[in-house]
């Protein structure tokens, strides 16, 4: 299970001030570019990709449609992704599949997509159908983050993940149940077949994230013989 740490600079100065030593133990850096305005993303990008050249990087623009900070038209969303991809070739590119279906055909040439679905309100009853639709597109990663209302929601997500991984062993899945109630799902990735877990430094990018130092210790305990 790889540990992903999101970074959320709101300016070039904040990006330049990020201290690499604080990311010890992280495997992947997720750059949440939506904390910038759309005109600043390409200005800040060189600082991000140069500083974190030793890590795998997920480029994410989490828009307001799925709980993010920036509002973009479909055209602006795709153009920004393509511009950053052409210049910096991030290891992974997040794509908000269900809210951007109309322009998904423009992304078919990308082999490094993280097809994602985020629901900060609930765990939808049709979660299996959502997972199935994304899995059938065979992206690099299928990512689902949902909010539980009760313990059964958490267990359902974990069981669905395990089932889909069993039937699609070559497909990478990243799933999590958010908030305090869903925290167990962030720790049991190896058990259910979720490849990544997200950990935080100072600020969380989603409810229920565990601090990086704590997650490193938890992984060490879980990986011990």
From Swiss-Prot:
Entry annotated with the keyword Signal: no
Binding site for 3-dehydroquinate: 30-32, 62, 186, 205, 209
GO MF annotation list: 3-dehydroquinate dehydratase activity
Keyword Amino-acid biosynthesis tagged: yes
Location of the active site: 118, 143
Alphabetical GO biological process terms: 3,4-dihydroxybenzoate biosynthetic process; amino acid biosynthetic process; aromatic amino acid family biosynthetic process; chorismate biosynthetic process
This protein's UniProt keywords: Amino-acid biosynthesis, Aromatic amino acid biosynthesis, Lyase, Schiff base
SUPFAM superfamilies with a match to the protein in the record: Aldolase
This protein's pathway: Metabolic intermediate biosynthesis; chorismate biosynthesis; chorismate from D-erythrose 4-phosphate and phosphoenolpyruvate: step 3/7
InterPro entries, per database record: Aldolase_TIM, DHquinase_I, Type-I_3-dehydroquinase
Catalytic activity annotation: 3-dehydroquinate = 3-dehydroshikimate + H2O
Residues of the signal peptide: none
Entry function: Involved in the third step of the chorismate pathway, which leads to the biosynthesis of aromatic amino acids. Catalyzes the cis-dehydration of 3-dehydroquinate (DHQ) and introduces the first double bond of the aromatic ring to yield 3-dehydroshikimate.
Assembly behavior: Homodimer.
Family that this chain belongs to: Belongs to the type-I 3-dehydroquinase family.
The protein, known as: 3-dehydroquinate dehydratase
Top-level taxonomy: Bacteria, Bacillati, Bacillota, Bacilli, Lactobacillales
């Amino acid at each position: 299970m790889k540990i992903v740490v999101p970074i959320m600079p709101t300016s070039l100065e904040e990006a330049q001030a990020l201290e690499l030593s604080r990311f010890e133990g992280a495997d992947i850096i997720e750059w949440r570019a939506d904390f910038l305005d759309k005109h600043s993303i390409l200005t800040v990008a060189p600082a991000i990709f140069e500083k974190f050249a030793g890590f795998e990087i997920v480029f994410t623009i989490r828009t307001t449609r799925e709980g993010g900070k920036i509002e973009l038209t479909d055209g602006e969303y795709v153009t920004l992704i393509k511009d950053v991809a052409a210049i910096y070739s991030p290891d992974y590119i997040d794509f908000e599949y269900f809210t951007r279906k109309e322009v998904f055909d423009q992304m078919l040439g990308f082999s490094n997509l993280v097809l994602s679905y985020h629901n900060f309100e609930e765990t939808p009853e049709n979660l299996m159908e959502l997972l199935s639709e994304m899995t059938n597109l065979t992206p690099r990663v299928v990512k689902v983050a949902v909010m539980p209302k009760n313990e059964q929601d958490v267990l359902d997500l974990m069981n669905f993940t395990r089932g889909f991984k069993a039937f699609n062993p070559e497909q990478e899945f990243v799933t999590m149940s958010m908030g305090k109630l869903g925290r167990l799902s962030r720790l049991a990735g190896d058990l259910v077949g979720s490849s990544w877990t997200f950990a935080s430094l100072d600020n969380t990018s989603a409810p229920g994230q565990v601090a990086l130092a704590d997650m490193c210790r938890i992984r060490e305990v879980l990986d011990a013989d």
